[in-house]
Amino acid sequence: MNEIHQPLARRVWRSNVDEEMARMAECLKRFPLIAFDTEYPGIIFRTYFDSSSDECYRAMKGNVENTKLIQCGFTLFNAKGEIGGVWEINFSNFGDPSDTRNELSIEFLRRHGLDLQKIRDEGVDMFGYGFFPKLMTVFRSQKHVEFVTFQGAYDFAYFLSILNHGKLPETHGEFATEVVKVFGQVYDTKVMAGFCEGLGEHLGLSKLAQLLQITRVGRAHHAGSDSLMTALVFIKLKHVYEDSRFARGLIYGIGKSNLVAAPAPAPVPEPTLPLMCQQNVASYPVFHNGYVQNYEQPQLVSYDPSGAPWAFCNATGTYVQLTHLPASTFAYPSQTPSATVDYLGPVPNYYNNNACYVVE
C-alpha cells in the first residue's frame, strides 16, 4: 500500500453537510472500520503523575463538559487496509468570547493552520443540526462496525457528552459501560503500539506514523488528517498481530489502573514486522533499567541457570516464577492482588501512569 495516494479529507461545512452525510453512509457499507479524531480548545483541569484514576476521570469529565468541540475527523476503511474516504467536520459552536479555552492550545491550532473564524462562520451547528445523533444512526445502519482511535479517551468522551446533552457519566466505570453500549468494539492504536518493542506509549501520532514509514496526507492536528493517520497506523499494526482481540476495549489516557473488567486475553500470534515492532512474547517486558512494570512495586527480573525468568518481589522479599506473579504485574491489574495468572503474552511498554483503560 502506498500512503502517498491516500485521499485528502473531504471538508464538511454547513453548506454541504447533508450531501457528505449521505456519501459517508454509502461508503460505510463497504468500509465498516471507523477511525476518528477530535480537535478541541485544550485542557483546563490538569492531573499529575500521582493522580488517582478517579482524579484523572474527573479532570477529563470537567474538561469535556466545559469546552466545545472544534473539529471531528472520520476515516472509513476495511480489513484489507483499503481507505474508503476521509471526512473532516467543522463545528461552528466554539468561538464566543466566553467559551472556555486554553489559550496556548488555541494558538497551537492556529499555528497548524486551523482557520477558527471560518469554522465559526461556516461550520455545522452540531446541536441545531443534530449531527452526532444523525451520525450514530448512519453507523448503526450497519450490522458490524468497529471504532479506532489514537489516545482515544477524550475522543470517546466528547462523542458521548454531545449525545448526552453535554454530560458524561459520574464515574469511569459508568463511562466504560457507555462506551461499550454506544460504540461496541473499540481499539486504541496508542495501546497497540505499547505492545511493540521500539515503539511504546511516549510517541505522538506523527512520530509513530513516521517510525512505521507512513506518509502523512494533509496537516497534523487537523481532525481529518489525524483520523487518516490513525487508520493507517492501525493497518500497519494489524500486520504485527493477525488476531488483534487482545487490544479490544483498551483506551489509553485515563490514569494508571482503570480496570472495569478484564477478559481473558486472546492469544497473540508471532509478529511479522521488523525487530522494531517485535513483541515481548516470551516473558514480561524487561525495561532498560531492569524493571518490569508494576503499579504497586517494581519487580526486578533475573534468570535461573536454566534461563527461566524469575522475579524478585520487593513487597515480600521472595523469588517467584513469572508465571505465578500477582496479577497486579499485568497491564490488566486484578481487583484481587493475591490472584495468580498464567498468561505470558505481551504487555504494553508503559512507563508512566497513563495506562490503558479497559472498557469491556
Swiss-Prot record:
Positions annotated to bind a divalent metal cation: D37, E39, D155, D226
UniProt-recorded Gene Ontology molecular function terms: metal ion binding; poly(A)-specific ribonuclease activity; RNA binding
Compartmental location: Nucleus; Cytoplasm
UniProt keyword DNA repair present: no
SUPFAM superfamilies in the cross-refs: Ribonuclease H-like (SSF53098)
Catalysed reactions, semicolon-separated: Exonucleolytic cleavage of poly(A) to 5'-AMP
EC category: hydrolase
Entry keyword annotation includes Metal-binding: yes
Annotated EC: 3.1.13.4
Gene3D superfamilies: Ribonuclease H-like superfamily/Ribonuclease H
Cofactor dependency: a divalent metal cation
Keyword annotations: Cytoplasm, Exonuclease, Hydrolase, Metal-binding, Nuclease, Nucleus, RNA-binding, Transcription, Transcription regulation
GO CC terms: CCR4-NOT complex; cytoplasm; nucleus
Family as reported in the entry's similarity comment: Belongs to the CAF1 family.
Binding partners and assembly: Component of the CCR4-NOT complex, at least composed of CRR4 and CAF1 proteins.
Function description: Ubiquitous transcription factor required for a diverse set of processes. It is a component of the CCR4 complex involved in the control of gene expression.
Name the UniProt record assigns to this protein: Probable CCR4-associated factor 1 homolog 1
Organism for this UniProt entry: Arabidopsis thaliana
